[in-house]
Amino acid sequence: MSETSSSRRSASKDAVKSYFAGKYNKVLDSILEAEAAISKSPTVAEDLSGSSSSGNSEMSHPSLTASSATSQGISKKELLQQIAGSLFSTSIERLKTAHSSEVSSTPEYSVNDSYGEQECRECDGVFKCSAHFEGAPEYYDDETESGPALEPMTSNSEKDPFIDVFLDKLISRLVPEKLPEREHFSSKTTIEHDLDTGRVPVFSATTLGSNFKKLSKKMGSIFELQDSIVRLLTWRNPTGTVTSLILFTLICFNPMYLVILPIFRFVYGIVVPGYVRKHPLQRSIYPLKRNHGSSLLYDVCYEGKNEYSYGQQFFSKSFMDTLESRNQEIDEISELDKRTENTGELKQGMKVLINLRDMQNMTSGTLHVIEAINSFLRKSSSFQNEECSTKRFFTGFLLIVFLKILSPFVNWSYVCSIFAWCLLIYMHPRAHPKIISFFKTGTMGKEYKNLKKREHQALNMIFDEQPETKFIEIFEIYKKALLPNDWKFFRYSNRIFDPQDPYRRAQQFPPGVDSLADVIPPTGWSFDPNFEWKIDNDVDRWVVERGLNLPITGEFLFDPMFKRRRLIHRVIKNATPVA
């Protein structure tokens, strides 16, 4: 009887707990929904105040753009509102998650839930008997790090730190729901369906940081390849450089080797050793074989390497080590693996730092290359130096004609092969200084050439064309104050802001700025420094051109609420910049 009464009491307690937990979750859900509805429906007054404080960054007129410090993005008030809403919703969700984890009485496990739920008399607490692990799959091999077999499953909100969840919430509020997509192989409807169903992930600071962390661990092989290429080009590995030149020559004369060699490497360098490790030969006695050297491919790629990386490759388990593993003592193997002075292994944290440093240097080098290319294209196409740009144009044109005529009569396989050999011979550390000294002229000859060049430049005549100029317009708008003859400055805009203007009919402020110093010329143009803003006194002309029927007084065009006058400025066309 006591057992039945205790079971009834526990059941009633569980029912009461589940009832209040459901009510608690409903209250939290209603608070979240109300907060989301408030954040998504701002009032009209807030929109008008935000637009009046920020304005618009680009005028619709093609001849004028205005810049302002607060011209882009949302206002400060809206930004603070979004931050507060994100912080509030994140706190509520974390509180809800913590409460649900406390209410739940049975924890879930990521591996073999059925074994955890079964009751066994032979089990002693958390220590399970062998019957629970007979049907468990073997997930780990010899190289896998040891760790706990069972890990409680937790939600993403519990695993992610509070600041990560808060940043994701804030980004989801500030960034539009559907960002412009890049080109995809799928159709547009498929992409939209994936976005709606959530298959395509949205922008997340947590995901971005996690991807960079994983990428920093995986970039080691790419930097190893970069080191190998540098060693080959600088002749630090002469055998590998000559072998690479021979392979490049074979590819030049038979491009099919470009497909055959990677397949050969995959089959005999990856698949076959993997099969041997998986299914070793069952032998009790092995004939002794003298090791004549390492693999040619490893010599080509890893010779001349630093101590850390070369030690890893040299002391890694080879083909014969796998075959003889059954006849070796376990103590000897473990002792060999613990010899850190031979393996040269670094800690995982140090590897990540090295990869991050290499990624930083790689991105810096990439930026320098991009800037150099843009600078070359800008100097070549902008015709700032007429002589240099003209020479490059005619040189390129003559090269196109010459190569087009000569290409059918040239064996390009020989040309590419000879060019590669000559280039690497030129880069040899011993041959490079001798070649430079052989082709280098004396100092007297160089000074004579510079003197002739100066005389030639002194005799040159530069015929500069007259720059292209035009006038841009902007309207100085005033708003009527309380007194009849009292007008207050409103803003500078490229729109007249008459009663039929779309912005005025929509009760919105026109795009513009509050100071003439913030007005910038159109792209590719610059203000004439010898010209100032000038008032256009010919009001009738530009009023008739626009078909307006409003009263004119002096240089102003009036309507019941606003008056405006036209200002003009001269601009000069610049050279078209390279994008």
Swiss-Prot record:
UniProt record, GO biological process: peroxisome organization
The entry's keywords: Glycoprotein, Membrane, Peroxisome, Peroxisome biogenesis, Transmembrane, Transmembrane helix
Name of the protein in question: Peroxisomal membrane protein PEX28
Parts of the chain on the Cytoplasmic side: 1-243, 414-579
Function: Involved in the regulation of peroxisome number, size and distribution.
Ranges annotated as biased composition (Low complexity): 49-63
Similarity section: Belongs to the PEX28-32 family. Peroxin-28 subfamily.
Gene Ontology, cellular component aspect: cytosol; peroxisomal membrane
Domain of life: Eukaryota
Glycosylated sites: 361
Transmembrane segments: 244-264, 393-413
Main location: membrane
Region spans: Disordered: 40-70
